């Protein structure tokens, strides 16, 4: 049975449990749940905060000015401590992890997007759990409130996840600030993220991390618009991850816009002018339009323009009609060499391969 793909984002407050350092017993409990789901067949991706807190603790809480450079220093020192903590705990269950350090630019740049996506899918296909963090040590503008909330939404789109869990120190989204109003009520389900929902999100957060409730609402908006159900839930609740995966009602659930699932992803992917043209034969045209298939090198007749792997190009028929936009797996130089050839010849011709297809069907949008 194919189980769903879930992205789980852990805020600093969840990993530290209010202390100035990573809370190992709590992380052990988190890993136990993820190991259970992993062994049950779920595909789990972790987006982890905590590098800055880990770095501050490792350096014995140095007095540093509140600057970008100070945060980068702490992140550079703390990232190795953070990944070691995850690695040691997963090793108890004989589960391997793979670290990816990303910035938003890595996902917005199409060639790097493809590389990141291929790496993530390779890890998941080989039963390795990806552990992702913002590359705070080299990022500049990216170090701001909500980095990993927003990053987790983009990662969820990247891996085509069914669900995104944003685990935090709050029970979910309330109709007012529960720390100020004891009568505040938890909102169990949000059908649509409206201005009213944004207005009640407030500005919660701790000085250990960089996140708050408003950034989670923004992340939920991005994810649900791409067809990904998003849940804000308490990271300290016993068995919260496993219970969410098995569909218990916890926290605040943001309903996915299922009708827009594929289209919104493609709008996100293809918001760029075309960099070239790939002309295809009648067989490839039929495969794409009638059979919903990917484009193989054998079906390519001509390649126009100079473009990189992952840039948007037009797919044109022999009669001159543009039938699709898409992101090729290979750059223009490589496609010139493999056009008209069988997929089995790719590695022999190029000396490498990014798979058997020139352009995957998931990376195309058909033009009406």
UniProtKB/Swiss-Prot annotation:
ATP binds at residues 9, 168-169, 210-216. One of its GO terms (biological process) is L-proline biosynthetic process. It is an enzyme of class 2 (transferase). Residues 275-353 form the PUA domain. It comes from the Bacteria. One of its GO terms (molecular function) is glutamate 5-kinase activity. Substrate binds at residues 49, 136, 148. Keywords: Amino-acid biosynthesis, ATP-binding, Cytoplasm, Kinase, Nucleotide-binding, Proline biosynthesis, Transferase. Its main location: cytoplasm. InterPro entries: AceGlu_kinase-like_sf, Asp/Glu/Uridylate_kinase, G5K_ProB, Glu/AcGlu_kinase, Glu_5kinase, Glu_5kinase/COase_Synthase, Glutamate_5-kinase_CS, PUA. Pathway: Amino-acid biosynthesis; L-proline biosynthesis; L-glutamate 5-semialdehyde from L-glutamate: step 1/2. It is found in: Cytoplasm. One of its GO terms (cellular component) is cytosol. SMART domains: PUA (SM00359). NCBIfam families: proB (TIGR01027). Belongs to the glutamate 5-kinase family. This is Glutamate 5-kinase. It comes from Haemophilus influenzae (strain PittEE). The lineage of its organism: Bacteria, Pseudomonadati, Pseudomonadota, Gammaproteobacteria, Pasteurellales. The gene is proB.
